[in-house]
Amino acid sequence: MSNLFDATALVVPFEKLRMTDVEIVGGKNASLGEMISQLPSGVKVPTGFATTAHAFREFLKFDGLTERINAKLDALDTEDVRALAAVGAEIRAMVEAQPFPADLETAIREAFVTLQGGQPDASFAVRSSATAEDLPDASFAGQQETFLNVHGIDEVLHKMKEVFASLYNDRAILSLIHISEPTRH
């Protein structure tokens, strides 16, 4: 960890991220932070913020979502393609319906106001940067959603849930189960 932010942070501005933060914010976010730190060298990178792996775990723990997801995954016959599709759709719907914990939503809203900088027509990208995407023994790259031209905090919050839910697409569920990815439990 780069020591530029608290380990229990829910949201971190890119400016405070470094490559040493991959396990906390994922490879894409850490790379953006590293590039921003090189701005004096002439590198131009759009600013932003990342939600942390801790924030994602808190989101999943809220209202027992982790237990409900794990119950679905534990009962899943991964050889049954129809069951996989049905369970995946159920889990994604559960994630998208899950409210944010109040402290996480507040942190996101505050970071958004700072990022928006008084420009109400600004548009944003909401994308994954899963901590497992860039690990040498796992290949999750390209499995999670990316949304461009997102306007306003309410749409950002909604798209964030869709990105979280995309961790449970059918291919990702199989990957999670077969490599026993720690985010499952």
What are these language model-derived features?
Residues 181-185:
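Short "domain-exit" segments at the C-terminal end of structured domains
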